[in-house]
Regions:
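Active-site-proximal alpha-helical segments within enzyme catalytic domains
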Residues: 34-55, 94-111
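Carbohydrate-binding/catalytic loop surfaces
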Residues: 25-38, 81-83, 89-91
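C-terminal, helix-dominated tail/subdomain
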Residues: 40-43, 57-71
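Active-site Gly/Thr loop motif
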Residues: 17-19, 63-116
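Structural helix-adjacent loops and short alpha-helical linkers that scaffold large soluble proteins
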Residues: 1-8, 54-62
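Non-transmembrane alpha-helical segments in soluble domains
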Residues: 7-8, 12, 44-51, 67-71, ...
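Short, gly/Ser/Thr-rich active-site loops of penicillin-recognizing serine hydrolases
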Residues: 117-122
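Active-site helix/loop module of the DD-peptidase/beta-lactamase fold
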Residues: 2-34
Length: 122
C-alpha cells in the first residue's frame, strides 16, 4: 500500500480531513519528508491526537505506546519548559505546539523558517 493511501485510510479519513495533498516525485511516489499540504484545522486535529494519548473523539488512531515513543526526549518533538511543552516543525515554518498541562494545541502555518521564532520572541 502506498504511504498516502495508508494515511488516508488510517489517519486522514478517520479524523475528518478531506483536503490534504502531498507532493510526489516524478515516479509518482509521495515525498514523505516534505510536501504535505494540510489545512490548519487538520493540523490541529493531528496535534490533538497526541494531546489525547492517541485518540480523536474517543476513537483510537495511534497506540499509546507510539505516542509515548514520539514524546520521548530527542525522538520526534522538541521539548520546552522542562519537557511539558512539545513542538514539531515543518518546512517553511509550519508548527504544531502541544501543551498538555493546559490541554491546548496551537498550529501555525508560516512562510519562512523564522516566522514562528519571530512571533514567539516579540
Amino acid at each position: 500500500m502506498r504511504t498516502d493511501d495508508f494515511l488516508w485510510k488510517y489517519l486522514f479519513y478517520p479524523i475528518g480531513c478531506r483536503e490534504v495533498a502531498w507532493s510526489s516525485c516524478p515516479q509518482g511516489h509521495v515525498i514523505g519528508a516534505t510536501g504535505l499540504y494540510i489545512r490548519i484545522e487538520d493540523l490541529v486535529k493531528h496535534g490533538s491526537i497526541y494531546l489525547n494519548g492517541g485518540t480523536y473523539k474517543n476513537k483510537r488512531i495511534l497506540s499509546q505506546s507510539w505516542v509515548d515513543t514520539v514524546f520521548a526526549k530527542g525522538y520526534e518533538f522538541k521539548t520546552y519548559d522542562n519537557g511539558v511543552t512539545f513542538e514539531k516543525g515543518g518546512m517553511n515554518g509550519q508548527r504544531v505546539v502541544i501543551v498538555p498541562h493546559l490541554n491546548r494545541v496551537v498550529a501555525w502555518l508560516g512562510y519562512g523558517e523564522n516566522d514562528f521564532k519571530n512571533l514567539t520572541t516579540q
